[in-house]
From Swiss-Prot:
V region of the variable domain of T cell receptor (TR) beta chain that participates in the antigen recognition. Alpha-beta T cell receptors are antigen specific receptors which are essential to the immune response and are present on the cell surface of T lymphocytes. Recognize peptide-major histocompatibility (MH) (pMH) complexes that are displayed by antigen presenting cells (APC), a prerequisite for efficient T cell adaptive immunity against pathogens. InterPro entries: Ig-like_dom, Ig-like_dom_sf, Ig-like_fold, Ig_V-set, TCR_beta_variable. Disulfide bonds join 42-111. The gene is TRBV18. It holds the Pfam family V-set. This is T cell receptor beta variable 18. It comes from the Eukaryota. It comes from Homo sapiens (Human). Alpha-beta TR is a heterodimer composed of an alpha and beta chain; disulfide-linked. The alpha-beta TR is associated with the transmembrane signaling CD3 coreceptor proteins to form the TR-CD3 (TcR or TCR). The assembly of alpha-beta TR heterodimers with CD3 occurs in the endoplasmic reticulum where a single alpha-beta TR heterodimer associates with one CD3D-CD3E heterodimer, one CD3G-CD3E heterodimer and one CD247 homodimer forming a stable octameric structure. CD3D-CD3E and CD3G-CD3E heterodimers preferentially associate with TR alpha and TR beta chains, respectively. One of its GO terms (biological process) is adaptive immune response.
């Protein structure tokens, strides 16, 4: 296996950009080298003020990370707080940040929204 690949975290947003889904995630795929920052965006359905972020590690099930309601973090019990942070500003998309990515951050990240 190429050793350069081992220094990267691959972050996938499955289902991103599907017009029928209503929720838009971008970028669809993101590759970062170890130590770089990853920034994932989620634009909820129109009229929705709640956003939920989930992560699915390889060979594992979907796990809750954080629940936000416009500018407020309601529940972040599933989010590793050392390098991860999330926000949902009054205007604009919700953003999930991963600082100084490591190989173990390679996963599929999903967001969902509700009214």
């Amino acid at each position: 296996m190429d050793t350069r690949l081992l220094c990267c975290a691959v972050i996938c947003l499955l289902g991103a950009g599907l017009s029928n889904a209503g929720v838009m995630q971008n970028p669809r795929h993101l590759v970062r080298r170890r130590g770089q920052e990853a920034r994932l965006r989620c634009s909820p359905m129109k009229g929705h003020s709640h956003v939920y972020w989930y992560r699915q590690l390889p060979e594992e099930g979907l796990k809750f990370m954080v629940y936000l309601q416009k500018e407020n973090i309601i529940d972040e019990s599933g989010m590793p707080k050392e390098r991860f942070s999330a926000e949902f500003p009054k205007e604009g998309p919700s953003i999930l940040r991963i600082q100084q990515v490591v190989r173990g951050d390679s996963a599929a990240y999903f967001c969902a929204s509700s009214p």
